[in-house]
Every structure is written in C-alpha cells, then in structure tokens.
Amino acid sequence: KIDIIVKKADATITTIPNAINDLAYSGEEQNLITEGSAEGGKVVYSLDGNTFTEDVPTATNAGEYTVYYNVVGDENHNGVEDTNAIVVTIKKATLTITAEDKSVTYGEEAPTYSVAYSGWKAQDNEDVLVGEITFECEYNTNSNVGTYAINISGVEAQNYEITFVSGVLTVNKANATITNNPNAINDLVYSGEEQTLITEGSAEGGK
C-alpha cells in the first residue's frame, strides 16, 4: 500500500491592492484602496492590523490611514502569511470664510460683523468649527470717511483647510445739520454804512 500525500499549494495575489490617490474629504465614506484578488484564496483587509475582513476599508474623516492586507488560503491552498501595509491619505476639503462687507455713516457705532461660508461638504455647518470667529477692524466712531478692512480669524476644523477672506467696511459721509438758524435783523434803518442783514448761523459737520 502506498500513501500519497497531496500538500496544499500556496495562494498567490493576482491583483495587488493600491492606494486610491487624490482622496479629499467629502463628508461621506470613501474606499481607501482598490480591491485586490488572489488565486487559491481571498484577500482580506484591516485598519488595525489585527481584525481582517474581506471588506475594502473605508473612511470619512481627513487624515492618514494605514491599510493592512494579506491572503487567506482556501481548502487547497496556504495563505500568504506576510502582511502588507498601504498608507492612504484623505486630504482636507477647502472651506472659505468671508467677512461680509458692511457700511456705516460717519460717527456711527461699528456694525455687527458677519461671515459667509463656501465649501461645506454633506451636512456640515458651523458646528464642526473649533474656536470662535474673531473680527478685527480699525474703525471706531472717530474714524474718518473711507474704507477699512474687516479681518477674520480664530477657527479651525478637523476636515477643512480654512481660507479667510477679508471684507470691507465703508464709512460714508454724514449729512451736515444746522445747529443755529440765521435770522433777519429787524428794524434796520439806512445809515449810510454797510450793515449786517442777518444773525450768523452755525452747523455741525459743515459751515
């Protein structure tokens, strides 16, 4: 009697998983790598290097991820024991925060400043910002007519690269007002000399 032992063959990777390039935060889950395939087994993946599944790893937040993979053999094949690693980056999305333009009349208090947002992904809004928006403007109630920059800063976000855009505060001329009306001088009689006909008036913001 002759016993014949058939040893398992080694499984081989036929399609190597690759990092998906140019990933940027979208607010949704995204595949981190392309799907691999193997002859005589199946490719399995992990984000922690311990728990492996057949599901291609996904991620939502911006950051750097390490995807581990190896091959589990079928009943006739040995798996590939070596674990490979792929580093994948999801870049931050761009968020633009713009200080909205404002205007006041000379002498008025500074307005309530505000901003506009451009670039939110999915359902994101101001709630994802860390910090508080700070407004800086050189205008005060004694400032002259003209334009003043409204600068902003003070916030950041995990998934966004923030661009701050300054606004413009325009200070317009105020209307001059008469504070003392000129009045006719009564009972003038010819005297042969020049005479003042009215009392002198005065104005605020002019003459």
Predicted features along the sequence, with ranges:
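Solvent-exposed beta-strand/loop surfaces, strongest in extracytoplasmic domains of secreted
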Residues: 1-207
